[in-house]
Amino acid sequence: MVAPPMAVSPLRPLLLFLLAAAFACHAADGSRSAYGHARGLGVNYGRVADDIPSPHRSVQLLRAAGAGSVKIYDANAPVLRALSGTRLTVSIMVPNEIIVDLAASYAAADKWVAANLLPHLPGTRIKYLLVGNEVLSDTSAATAATVWPRIVPAMENLHRSLRARGVSRVKISTTLAMDALVTGAFPRPPSAAAFRPDIAEPVLRPLLRFLNGTNSYYFVDAYPYFVWAGSNGTVPLDYALFNGGATRYVDPGTGLAYTNLLDEMLDAVGTAMSKLGHPEVRLAIAETGWPNAGDYDQIGASARNAAVYNRNLAARMARNPGTPARPGARMPVFVFSLYNEDLKPGPGTERHWGLYYPNGTAVYQVDLAGRRPLSAYPPLPAPGNDTPYKGPIWCVLAAHAAKKLNETAVGDALTYACGQGNDTCDAIQPGGECFQPNTGAAHASYAFNSYWQQLRKTGATCYFNNLAEQTIKDPSYGSCKFQSSLG
């Protein structure tokens, strides 16, 4: 996508100077950390599921995919023991819930380090300690007042503990989503990006100062999928999948040309850091990827697109790291995720980011080391949902839930759906059109659908604790009519 001709911004020389300075710092730094940069992309190993393989088997699958590192969302001891003796570098995480405690007390931070990190060194190659996950995305008044100001103090206490114990290999940071920027996930042009005013000075300036002083990274969660899916066709799919070819976007502020969406997103973060006086802070991608499936109303979520994105990402990072503003700058990159996680709430895509199904079979082939030529992969299935689905959709009791009915769980979900008012469940009351058959399964399907159809536009999802699923087959029967809405 080529931007229309525009006058050169008077800020362009300053922006180019800052970008050049940032690149100089990155090029000079090279690979200073004790473990160096992993050779293959990393993988996020989430475990919000009840059916995934053991940690030992998971390590085997990570290595089979060519992963060079792994990131977990806690400091789970069995997982860290399974990683011991491997060449995988590891990122662990402090949960959001204890940030305030670690900030208030050095003793608490030191105790956490002693209990959760030290027992696994040096056998497990722990390289990053991330303090919280997307904390700044929670904009509730309570979190903003009590947790945001404590992120950096918690990091400082943990860093002090590591130094006191002679641990110099572990870098401390936190993860931030693209919503830390004023413009959110799609800050175009990148040269105009800036951090949100509610966090720029009180949180991010001290955070960047800490990262710079400890030679650590700004970890960002960057998902081109969501930008593309929400662009209403203004962003080409190939541009989001690294298949842009001649498709380019030129930043009018810097003159830099972009051939893919991820680079735009990363350089926007770099610009925002420069505006706070820290162009030298290095970037890391804490999460990125593409969903391999989703709901009927979720465009482009397919195994084909997921394979193309991750294969191209691995090849790109192996041969041509960096971005237009930071050419050649190597960065840690973690793909989301190792498995499809069946207990993640929200729309269908939330449960379909995995490289592997829960039984350990690959969703698609990928070499995260980027060494396998793209032409050497077997053909992918044809895309089936790269354009929006326009037909009717219903929300019903999921087939797996109906097959092995948990009456208590279904009853709780039914009570929740019917408790929202708006005549949601009138039709399944005695004498109603849908009362028969008088079973929990039949009533649940009606209630789930009625609730979802009424509240879908306000963010409701067809999930109900993994008991519901979308269908395009009309579940109506006899005089019982299920309301529908178009995709």
Where are these regions (language model features)?
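Terminal membrane/secretory targeting segments in land-plant proteins
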Residues: 1-42, 381-390, 486-487
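Hydrophobic faces of well-ordered beta-strands that scaffold small-molecule active sites
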Residues: 41-45, 68-72, 88-94, 127-131, ...
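Short, acidic/polar
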Residues: 46-62, 106-119, 201-205, 409-413
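Solvent-exposed loop/turn segments at secondary-structure junctions
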Residues: 48-50, 75-79, 96-99, 133-138, ...
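Catalytic domains of carbohydrate-active enzymes, especially glycoside hydrolases
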Residues: 56-78, 89
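Substrate-binding cleft of extracellular glycoside hydrolase catalytic domains
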Residues: 79-180, 186-196, 285
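Substrate-binding and catalytic surfaces of secreted/luminal carbohydrate-active proteins
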Residues: 156-164, 168-173, 181, 194-455, ...
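All-alpha RGS (Regulator of G-protein Signaling) helical domain and cognate RGS-like helical scaffolds
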Residues: 467-479
